[in-house]
Regions:
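Short helix-initiation/N-cap motifs at beta->coil->alpha
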Residues: 1, 129-140
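Alpha-to-beta junction loops
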Residues: 2-9, 143-153
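Ligand-binding "clamshell"
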Residues: 16-28, 160-172
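Short Pro/Gly-enriched coil loops immediately N-terminal to beta-strands
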Residues: 28-36, 171-179
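A bilobed periplasmic-binding-protein/Venus flytrap-type ligand-binding module shared by bacterial periplasmic
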Residues: 35-53, 179-192
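Periplasmic-binding protein-like
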Residues: 58-79
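Immediate post-signal peptide segment of exported/extracytoplasmic ligand-binding proteins
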Residues: 81-101, 120-121, 190-194
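Short, well-ordered beta-strand elements
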Residues: 95-107, 125-131, 195
Length: 195
């Protein structure tokens, strides 16, 4: 940051770089952003028990609390009315002993999924979190059916990806936002912009 006056950085990049958005940003975007990070599945799998179990677990109070307690506002849950982590329409007895696979980026997505893993384990369902550090493979492995779901992107990115790659991956849940922050480099306040 020393080479620029200001930099706009997404919390997804700030956190792994050791930058704390809530204390280091001069200003931050609010939680009403259109760029919520989503859980996505292959089109046609939106209503499977695996998907519904995953949605319920990611929509849980446990996940919302984990996000609030661990990211200090750098990641904000957008789930309204979080539940207990389970969907009463899912046949968890039939899912018992199965594995649900999710492609995710390491931070914060895979970290958040660790909470989901514990929730699903209560019903004897294994969550296999497969970490990716790129933004192409997670959609390809879901579209091919190799992986059940992914959690790493926002809807505008997914829509562009589908259009450019003829894939059929759809959003089933908005989970959180990673607000953009404006950080000072050579400048330490917003005074230079106010002129």
């Amino acid at each position: 940051l020393q080479d620029v006056d200001y930099a706009v950085i997404n919390s997804n990049y700030a956190l792994p770089a050791g930058i704390n958005p809530t204390t280091d940003a001069l200003v931050m975007e609010g939680s009403s952003s259109a760029y919520s990070n989503i859980l996505a599945v292959k089109e046609g799998n939106e209503e499977t028990d695996k998907t519904k179990a995953l949605v319920a677990a990611l929509s849980s109070k446990q996940v919302a609390d984990y996000i609030a307690e661990n990211y200090d506002g750098a990641v904000i849950s957008v789930v309204e009315n979080p539940g207990d982590g389970y969907d009463e329409t899912v046949d968890y007895d039939a899912l018992s002993g199965t594995t649900i696979s999710v492609a995710a980026t390491p931070s914060p997505h895979a970290e958040i999924l660790s909470v989901v893993k514990d929730i699903l384990a209560e019903k004897n369902v294994t969550l296999n979190i497969i970490e990716y550090t790129d933004y192409v493979q997670p959609n390809k492995v879901v579209d091919s059916g190799e992986v059940d779901a992914n959690y790493f992107q926002h809807l505008p990115y997914l829509e562009d990806f589908n259009a450019e790659n003829n894939t059929h991956v759809v959003s089933v849940l908005a989970v959180h936002v990673e607000p953009m922050g404006l950080y000072g480099g050579k400048q330490t306040s917003l005074d230079a912009i106010k002129k």
